[in-house]
Amino acid sequence: MSSISGLVEDEISSFFESSPPLKNKEEIVANLNQFIELNSSCQGGMRRIVCVTSGGTTVPLEQRCVRYIDNFSSGNRGAASTENFVKAGYAVIFLYRRGTCQPYCRYLPDDPFLECFEFPDAKNIQVHGSHSGAVKMAVMDQQAAVAEGRLLKLPFSTIYEYLQMLRLIATILKDVGPCSMFYLAAAVSDFYVPWLSMTEHKIESGSGPLDIRLAQVPKMLSILRSNWAPKAFCISFKLETDSKILLEKATKALQKYKVHAVVANELLTRKEEVVVVSSSGNVVVRRDSNKPESIVEDNLIRLLVDRHSTYIKESLT
């Protein structure tokens, strides 16, 4: 893997050096090391480990943040993909935006949480009959994944938290080599306000129109591929609203960042089909319309698991 340019490396270093310190860093590192050690020593040898990123990052406008710019993402794809990876035998580091969709919770009712419960008497509480099946399944699946040591959930909110945590995960996964995967489904901000240039306190609304100069977020994919975890299998995503430019931009991303595949999805059809763009050609992956419960992630993860298997075999020969 060729090294990244000095200019890009300087931009990345500058971003991290000027970022606010990551809270609970020592605890995060300890949890990651414990998780990886557990899945490295399981019966049958090393278990495959995937980092799934999910949800959108925020860009604070003040250091004591009241206002922010948001990259919206429900996190549904990341949550659904995590479930499928666990089903395929992977251990999953789920790096997710606080408040977004969680694994095993996609089929829970949209009603407010408290409406799922009822009081049969003064001393007991139980799940309402109409919701009992979904709640039971969600709790059982979630607890099984955690009890088996195959799901570690790490939350973020800001672009600063996300990128610092991604770097931590990648550098710790470096020793896992080809058995590790990155599935980068998070909606990451392209622009941000540098920490040292933003005001500390709430921006006053009475001072007239607000002009903000946004800097470009350094592209971390290049350094993830070349330095942080060069042997990991890496999948990135490209979302566009214009289908005419989608495949062209996905192909450019594939070539520029040297990832193993780019999942191209168009905003209006993203739940029905995606295109997996790779050096071996493009593959259209669709939801199985004959199965009402089917989601596109079922077939997408199945394809990527097969690709990862091939990659591991080739890496060991």
Swiss-Prot record:
GO molecular function annotation: phosphopantothenate--cysteine ligase activity
Cysteine pairings via disulfide bonds: none
Superkingdom per UniProt: Eukaryota
The EC number(s) this enzyme carries: 6.3.2.51
Pfam families according to UniProt: DFP
Keyword terms of this UniProt record: Coenzyme A biosynthesis, Ligase
Reaction catalysed by this enzyme: (R)-4'-phosphopantothenate + L-cysteine + ATP = N-[(R)-4-phosphopantothenoyl]-L-cysteine + AMP + diphosphate + H(+)
Pathway it works in: Cofactor biosynthesis; coenzyme A biosynthesis; CoA from (R)-pantothenate: step 2/5
GO biological process, one term: coenzyme A biosynthetic process
InterPro entries, per the entry: CoaB-like_sf, DNA/pantothenate-metab_flavo_C
Top-level enzyme category: ligase
Family the UniProt entry places it in: Belongs to the PPC synthetase family.
Role summary: Catalyzes the first step in the biosynthesis of coenzyme A from vitamin B5/pantothenate, where cysteine is conjugated to 4'-phosphopantothenate to form 4-phosphopantothenoylcysteine. The catalytic activity is not CTP- but ATP-dependent.
Known partners and oligomeric status: Homodimer.
Entries under PANTHER family matching the protein: CORNICHON-RELATED (PTHR12290)
Protein name: Phosphopantothenate--cysteine ligase 1
Organism, scientific name: Arabidopsis thaliana (Mouse-ear cress)
Gene name of the record: PPCS1
